[in-house]
From Swiss-Prot:
Protein's name according to its UniProt entry: Aspartyl/glutamyl-tRNA(Asn/Gln) amidotransferase subunit C
Transmembrane segments: none
SUPFAM superfamilies given in the database record: Glu-tRNAGln amidotransferase C subunit
Record's catalysed reaction(s): L-glutamyl-tRNA(Gln) + L-glutamine + ATP + H2O = L-glutaminyl-tRNA(Gln) + L-glutamate + ADP + phosphate + H(+); L-aspartyl-tRNA(Asn) + L-glutamine + ATP + H2O = L-asparaginyl-tRNA(Asn) + L-glutamate + ADP + phosphate + 2 H(+)
InterPro entries on file: Asp/Glu-ADT_sf_sub_c, GatC
């Protein structure tokens, strides 16, 4: 399956990314190769292979959900370049909130 440069530009726009024409062409080629490799899986004969739900030999391994005392606000904000009203202030990345 060929991924077109128009499709790469569309997904990049939705992701708020910008690529040069050369990068767009390279991504289209790379993504097309990846999709082709994945499509090869459709050719694998799985007749007689038991259906599985997981390939991992472990079940969910979770830690106990125990509250722990965190650092003080002063300690956390020690390396923050800019803050406002007890929040970390970061540069805006979306103009007017974006359209996504």
């Amino acid at each position: 399956m060929k991924i077109s440069e128009a499709e790469v530009r569309h997904v990049a726009k939705l992701s708020k990314l910008e690529f040069s024409d050369q990068e767009t062409a390279e991504f289209a080629t790379s993504l097309s190769k990846i999709v082709d490799m994945v499509e090869l899986l459709n050719e694998v004969d799985t007749t007689g292979v038991a259906v599985t739900t997981t390939m991992a030999d472990r079940k969910n391994v979770l830690r106990a959900d125990i509250a722990q005392k965190g650092e003080s606000r002063e300690e956390l904000f020690k390396n923050v370049p800019e803050s406002q009203d007890n929040f970390i202030k970061v540069p805006a990345i979306l103009d007017g909130g974006g359209d996504a």
